[in-house]
């Protein structure tokens, strides 16, 4: 999945590209993206869901790589658009250079930077007013602990994203 491949691209290309351009991710992307990027001294910008937000920023600024959970990955040195063929070539090149199975590399990345975790819940509402009321209610009633994990942060960029403490 992209939750595995975007971290792979950042890790692999970060080893061979000599730049410090930032990484773009949508709010729905796993925080392993942030962990890898920060290990390479890259800023990470978290954007609303949708590749259009990534493309807009790629057009305006020098960007290393940007991706979203649905599979869209854009490479800053190529073009500000999703390109599956280019991504496949980068992936195959990396596999050939490392001379190991992809799952082994992905396991190493998760050992070094934490697990890739993704859980998304989409809820349809009959109108915007009801949606806003439910969102406000949830925000006002978020517990300090979730399943015995301390709440670390709340993102309201595009919906509600809860980050819990790893420990």
PLM features: what roles do these ranges have?
Residues 1-14:
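Cysteine protease catalytic core and zymogen-processing segment of caspase-like enzymes
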Residues 15-167:
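Phosphate-binding and adjacent anionic-ligand microenvironments
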């Amino acid at each position: 999945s992209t939750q595995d491949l975007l971290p792979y691209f950042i890790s692999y290309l970060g080893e061979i590209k000599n730049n410090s351009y930032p990484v773009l991710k949508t709010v729905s992307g796993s925080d392993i993206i942030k962990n890898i990027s920060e290990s390479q001294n890259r800023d990470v910008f978290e954007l609303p869901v949708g590749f259009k937000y990534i493309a807009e920023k790629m057009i305006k600024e020098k960007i290393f790589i940007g991706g979203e959970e649905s599979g869209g990955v854009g490479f800053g040195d190529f073009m500000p658009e999703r390109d599956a063929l280019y991504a496949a070539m980068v992936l195959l090149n990396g596999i050939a250079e490392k001379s190991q199975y992809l799952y082994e590399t992905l396991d190493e990345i998760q050992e070094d930077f934490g697990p890739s975790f993704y859980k998304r819940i989409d809820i349809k509402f009959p109108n915007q007013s009801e949606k806003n009321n439910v969102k406000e209610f949830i925000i006002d009633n978020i517990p300090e602990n979730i399943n015995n994990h301390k709440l670390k942060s709340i993102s309201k960029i595009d919906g509600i994203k809860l980050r819990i403490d790893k420990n």
